[in-house]
């Protein structure tokens, strides 16, 4: 069944018998209620692998004013406003794998004061004040910051940052969160990988929130866009965002990782098991928890078996909008440490997109952290600089 035929059903709002023209299924496709703050009448429709998509462009024309997003890369599907009848028609269609209600996603940050994280990831013990690193510093890599945007004109980025996609009227970072994360990844003073290229993808509004359907579209964009960029040493996606569990978001993140992008995500700031949050609960990507300067799990950081690594996340000083700096806390701040470290290691030839998270875990400082719950890794990111 071609996607154009499938999506062509939507504008008609037919009663269930309208699917008689296509092959019937024995049971309707699952209808998943996303955890968290759901959005009324907004749905993400995931098609089965192997569904023919030759007429996707025609389908998009038929959905003019109906589809919010059409996904072509990380998985096949779309997001749209659907009433109950439309949902039931689509659930009966043999090409639909599942339908999930859209939900709100937020940044994972809190306000705080004081810098220290870079020194910690280049040392085997806490309390140091010097960041030690190889001067290659992530050169030849690209890091996508999927967030509130990036203030590319900030002097700390030295012309290495640019906005490449926005889902809002303005590409400007009116929040600061994305710029802060980008600074920890690759700014001149506060960055782990000081020579990487930074690409901003604005999926969250200036209040720091957005829809899962938009997050998925941002990942879909990255999966295609990076192939047209000059990133010979590797590509990373940093996502310091999260919300309640979502099958669609997890699937998108897993497929972005599989496409050749190292995906680092925030564990979340709920002091709870990260398996109940997305994209943190996706096992094939790199889920990052936060620590403080005393090597304690940050009081807010999520935990559990889905975490891969911890990194500094309390009182992290980095770039801010308006050409300034600010110190904030969250697993949002820990994640760019790991994203930057992945880019750094890729340039050195020690890691690739497929194995970077595993390599970081294998070479981490082990057993140094306190306030770690049973079943959670006791691993703190470390760059293993030997110079």
UniProtKB/Swiss-Prot annotation:
UniProt-annotated binding residues for Ca(2+) 2: 124, 368
InterPro entries per the UniProt record, alphabetical: PCSK9_ProteinaseK-like, Peptidase_S8/S53_dom, Peptidase_S8/S53_dom_sf, Peptidase_S8_Asp-AS, Peptidase_S8_His-AS, Peptidase_S8_Ser-AS, Peptidase_S8_subtilisin-like, Peptidase_S8_subtilisin-rel
Cofactor note: Binds 2 calcium ions per subunit.
Residue ranges annotated as propeptide in the record: 22-108
Peptidase S8 domain span: 115-387
Annotated disulfide bonds: 142-231, 286-357
Molecular function per GO: metal ion binding; serine-type endopeptidase activity
Cofactor(s) the protein requires to work: Ca(2+)
Signal peptide positions (record): 1-21
Protein's UniProt keywords contain Magnesium: no
Residue span(s) of domain Inhibitor I9: 42-107
Temperature dependence: Thermostable.
GO cellular component: extracellular region
Xref: Pfam families: Inhibitor_I9, Peptidase_S8
Chain residues that bind Ca(2+) 1: 308
Presence of the UniProt keyword Signal in the record: yes
EC id: 3.4.21.-
Alphabetical keyword list: Calcium, Disulfide bond, Hydrolase, Metal-binding, Protease, Serine protease, Signal, Zymogen
Active-site residue numbers: 147 (charge relay system), 177 (charge relay system), 332 (charge relay system)
One GO term of the biological process aspect: proteolysis
Lineage top rank: taxon: Eukaryota
Record-stated family: Belongs to the peptidase S8 family.
Function summary: Serine proteinase.
Stated name of the protein: Proteinase R
Species of origin: Parengyodontium album
Organism taxonomic ancestry: Eukaryota, Fungi, Dikarya, Ascomycota, Pezizomycotina
Gene: PROR
């Amino acid at each position: 069944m071609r996607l154009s035929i499938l999506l062509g059903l939507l504008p008609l709002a037919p009663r269930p018998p309208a699917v008689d023209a296509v092959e019937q299924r024995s049971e309707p496709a699952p209808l998943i209620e996303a955890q968290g703050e759901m959005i009324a009448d907004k749905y993400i429709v995931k098609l089965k692998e192997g569904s023919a998509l030759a007429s996707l462009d025609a389908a998009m024309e038929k959905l003019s004013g109906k589809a919010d997003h059409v996904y072509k890369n990380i998985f096949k599907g779309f997001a749209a406003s659907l009433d109950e009848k439309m949902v039931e028609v689509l659930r009966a269609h043999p090409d639909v794998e599942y339908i999930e209600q859209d939900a709100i996603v937020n940044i994972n940050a809190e306000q705080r004061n004081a810098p220290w994280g870079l020194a910690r990831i280049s040392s085997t013990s806490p309390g140091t004040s010097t960041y030690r690193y190889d001067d290659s510093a992530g050169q030849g890599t690209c890091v996508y910051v999927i967030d509130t945007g990036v203030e590319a004109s900030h002097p700390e980025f030295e012309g290495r940052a640019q906005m490449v996609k926005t889902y809002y009227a303005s590409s400007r970072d009116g929040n600061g969160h994305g710029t802060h994360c980008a600074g920890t990844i690759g700014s001149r003073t506060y960055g782990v990988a000081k020579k990487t290229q930074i690409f901003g993808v604005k999926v969250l509004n200036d209040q720091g929130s957005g829809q899962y359907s938009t997050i998925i579209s941002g990942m879909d964009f990255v999966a295609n866009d990076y192939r047209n960029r000059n990133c010979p040493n590797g590509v990373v996606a940093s996502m310091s965002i999260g919300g309640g569990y979502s099958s669609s978001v997890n699937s998108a993140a897993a497929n972005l990782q599989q496409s050749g992008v190292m995906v680092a995500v925030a564990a979340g700031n709920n002091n709870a098991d990260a398996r109940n949050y997305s994209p943190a609960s996706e096992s094939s990507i790199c889920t990052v928890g936060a620590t403080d300067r005393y090597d304690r799990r940050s009081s807010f950081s999520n935990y559990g078996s889905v975490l891969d690594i911890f990194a500094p996340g309390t009182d992290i000083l980095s770039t801010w909008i308006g050409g300034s700096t600010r110190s904030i806390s969250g697993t949002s701040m820990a994640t760019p440490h790991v994203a930057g470290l992945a880019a750094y290691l890729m340039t050195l030839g020690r890691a690739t997109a497929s194995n970077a998270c595993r390599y970081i875990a294998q070479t981490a400082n082990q057993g140094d952290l306190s306030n770690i719950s049973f079943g959670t890794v006791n691993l703190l990111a470390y760059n293993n600089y030997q110079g």
